Amino acid sequence: MVFFHQPLPLCQRLYYMDIDLYRYFIGRDDQSVNESVMVKRVDQQLRVTKIMIDAVDLYALPESQKKLRAYMFNYLSMMMAISSVFLTMDGRPEAFEKKTELWQYLKNHDERVYNKCSHSVAGACNLPGTLGHKITLWGYHVAQKIFKFN
């Protein structure tokens, strides 16, 4: 994710090449996309999300790149949602502290992106309190059934 996020604003054209560069066997229990593995490795997810927050000032992109800005914002928002959901799944007080720290990190870095993100699906994954956590997990499981992930 980081390898394309930072240089993307500098790209003029993208080309699709229909070749296998990497083969990935899906279905192993210890796979990184396995839900329980993601919860255990949430620190890696947080590290990548913070790198993406730092990588590009979305509002410094020229008006001619507003579609790129929207795409990059949506991707960052998705990363915030994923991090928030897996930290909520963890359920430990330290995990909730990490979630608060992540959102504060985004706010300190760029308040405009924070405000927009907190009023998106990612913000809905950051609802406070026990009821908010239950709603977040319920929404995750509904999305899981609709989009067939994990």
Where are the regions a protein language model picked out?
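C-terminal, non-catalytic tails of nucleotide-sugar-dependent glycosyltransferases
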Residues: 44-71, 112-116
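Nucleotide-sugar-dependent glycosyltransferase catalytic core
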Residues: 4, 10-48, 90-97
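Short, charged, amphipathic alpha-helical segments
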Residues: 66-74, 96-100
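Secondary-structure edge/capping motif, primarily at the C-terminal ends of alpha-helices
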Residues: 28, 56-63, 86-91
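Hydrophobic core segments within long, regular secondary-structure runs in both alpha-
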Residues: 42, 46-53, 99-107
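Membrane-interface aromatic/basic loop that binds lipid-linked glycans or pyrophosphate carriers
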Residues: 89-150
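Amphipathic alpha-helical repeat scaffolds of TPR domains
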Residues: 70-86
